[in-house]
Amino acid sequence: MLSRRIIPCLDVRDGRVVKGVKFRDHIDMGDIVELAMRYRDQGADELVFYDIGASPEGRSVDYAWVERVARLIDIPFCVAGGIRDVETARAVLHAGADKISINSPALGRPQLISELADAFGVQCVVVGIDSIREEDGQWRVRRYTGDPSKTQALPMRTLDWVAEAQRLGAGEIVLNCMDNDGVRHGYDIAQLRQVRALCRVPLIASGGAGEMQHFADVFDQADADGALAASVFHSGAIPIPELKRFLRAQQIEVRDGQ
């Protein structure tokens, strides 16, 4: 069994880290580089940066802060936001990112997944999926969630998109459970279990962490490979070293940290 990964998520807007609830009402959480260095020192396994305005605004990520982060941390990090083609992805990786993540652009042009996998290898290609439960009880995909005024509800079922993304070459899936985002009531175990049943690549759970037991639950009950969280880390409610000690005490294998 591979070690489970603890992954702080940093949503970036206008050069700052922000955090919202259910992808809305974002507040400032601090400087990108300062937070990245804090999590490096605390023993995070990797970091994910989402430039949440890039896709809705039709632009690419700001390479300057990617380069600054790469110079100062020695843990893997993934960058998402406005990556629509191989050239942009190459620039992000050249700036120092270890992986790139695509979400809305892949929904508009699914072949982008294959193009990136062919160019850089599947290990570099993460597909993020923003999923919400609709009135009919089905989980469906949304895009442009970084800007509530531009968010689009799509008819595609989440499970169908997970299967298609893998077929096209996704090397990892990050499932952002929008109903649970920022509310700290726990991960969406029911949805994650369904996705896990058909997901052959690493699955990262996102949305809902509020206490240490929630991390244990998502590893034990949904068999997630990693758990991504934001507000509980940014606020200091859950220090990563304490979280790892807690998980080890429950016989969950995690990488050594502080």
Curated annotation (Swiss-Prot):
UniProt KW Amino-acid biosynthesis keyword: yes
InterPro entries: Aldolase_TIM, His_biosynth, HisF, IGPS_HisA/HisF, RibuloseP-bd_barrel
Keywords for this protein: Amino-acid biosynthesis, Cytoplasm, Histidine biosynthesis, Lyase
One GO CC annotation: cytoplasm
One GO BP: L-histidine biosynthetic process
A Gene Ontology molecular function term of the record: lyase activity
Presence of the UniProt keyword Oxidoreductase in the record: no
Major localisation: cytoplasm
Cellular localisation: Cytoplasm
EC numbers: 4.3.2.10
Database matches in SUPFAM superfamilies: Ribulose-phoshate binding barrel (SSF51366)
Catalytic activity: 5-[(5-phospho-1-deoxy-D-ribulos-1-ylimino)methylamino]-1-(5-phospho-beta-D-ribosyl)imidazole-4-carboxamide + L-glutamine = D-erythro-1-(imidazol-4-yl)glycerol 3-phosphate + 5-amino-1-(5-phospho-beta-D-ribosyl)imidazole-4-carboxamide + L-glutamate + H(+)
Pathway(s) it belongs to: Amino-acid biosynthesis; L-histidine biosynthesis; L-histidine from 5-phospho-alpha-D-ribose 1-diphosphate: step 5/9
CDD domains per record: HisF
Active site: D11, D130
NCBIfam families: hisF
Family of this protein: Belongs to the HisA/HisF family.
Quaternary state and interactors: Heterodimer of HisH and HisF.
HAMAP family associated with the record: HisF
Function description: IGPS catalyzes the conversion of PRFAR and glutamine to IGP, AICAR and glutamate. The HisF subunit catalyzes the cyclization activity that produces IGP and AICAR from PRFAR using the ammonia provided by the HisH subunit.
PANTHER family the record matches: IMIDAZOLE GLYCEROL PHOSPHATE SYNTHASE HISHF, IMIDAZOLE GLYCEROL PHOSPHATE SYNTHASE SUBUNIT HISF/H IGP SYNTHASE SUBUNIT HISF/H
This protein's name: Imidazole glycerol phosphate synthase subunit HisF
Species this chain originates from: Xanthomonas campestris pv. campestris (strain ATCC 33913 / DSM 3586 / NCPPB 528 / LMG 568 / P 25)
